[in-house]
Amino acid sequence: GAAILTNDNAMDALQDL
């Protein structure tokens, strides 16, 4: 996922973990 820039990207960032 992308960096946390928006609320929509928050879940994508968790997947990057």
UniProtKB/Swiss-Prot annotation:
It is found in: Secreted; Bacterial flagellum. It comes from the Bacteria. GO terms for cellular component: bacterial-type flagellum; extracellular region. Its main location: secreted. The keyword Secreted applies. Keywords: Bacterial flagellum, Secreted. Belongs to the bacterial flagellin family. Flagellin is the subunit protein which polymerizes to form the filaments of bacterial flagella. Flagella are an important component in the invasiveness of B.bacilliformis. This is Flagellin. It comes from Bartonella bacilliformis. The lineage of its organism: Bacteria, Pseudomonadati, Pseudomonadota, Alphaproteobacteria, Hyphomicrobiales.
